[in-house]
Amino acid sequence: MEYQRGDIVLVDLEPVRGSEQGRTRPCIIIQNDIANRFSPVTKIIPVTDAHNVKKSYPCLVYLSQTKDEMAKDSVAQCNQIRTIDAENRIIKRIGRIREQKMKEIDQALRIHLALM
């Protein structure tokens, strides 16, 4: 299956090591569409329940249950960029991030990666 930048996908992130985000969870594809078309791997950021986040950081983007197609209020963790094998780790596509919210994610990625 071909995925696009901004797709929300359910991903099996196990096994992990140390402080890496784990379990099966929603993730957002951040890799460009050309690379997604031709590469077996893709770049994702994991999403976690907003109630699990104790502090606000510039690398976190809040996602609304009602506006952003999430099962509950959540946080995109732009500080946890992962490269995954799309065929073996992605279970299914579950939604798509709004363009405005993707711009916020892009900004958080720029801050996290010092690309500003």
Range-by-range predicted roles:
Residues 1-116:
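Conserved functional hotspots at enzyme active or ligand-binding sites that engage polyanionic ligands
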